[in-house]
Amino acid sequence: MRHRTGFNPLSCMAAHRRALRRNMVTSLFKFERITTTKPKAAEVRRAAERLITRSKSDSVHNRRQVARFIWDKAVLHKLFADIGPRMREREGGYTRILKLGLRQGDAAHVVVLELVDYTFEKSLKKRARTDSVPARKGAGKKDASRVSGTVPDGQSQKIGKKKE
């Protein structure tokens, strides 16, 4: 019996899994909140917690270790200048997973992965968008000839009957 042969948590190759984790962690630190599936969020959470722990003490060694994982210099700077100091008093549990429900297309469990001190009001100020859908061009105007049964030159005739 072959024990422990079933390791493939995201059903993808190792290089793709590594790139996926790296990109999602970078997005998490950049936007401080991402929406994804539950298994991906669990993988990203594990990596993000380790990187935040390293970013709490700003040293050359820690910067280089984190830079192996996060290639975006702006996100790396944000991690060490903003996120790390904010989490300095916390001993772990820097992220939270909020369940959103099932995705309609494939019934996958969708969750929100966010940093613990993330505030929703802060993001609302950044994205001031309206919830209304813009109307189509010309919506609401009806063709007068179709409604009243008039011909465009002004003569009226009955709709549906031919003149013989």
UniProtKB/Swiss-Prot annotation:
Pfam families per UniProt: Ribosomal_L17
Record's keyword terms, sorted: Ribonucleoprotein, Ribosomal protein
Region (Disordered): 127-164
Source organism superkingdom: Bacteria
GO MF assignments: structural constituent of ribosome
Family classification: Belongs to the bacterial ribosomal protein bL17 family.
NCBIfam families: L17
Identification of the protein by name: Large ribosomal subunit protein bL17
Organism of this sequence: Treponema pallidum (strain Nichols)
Gene behind the chain: rplQ
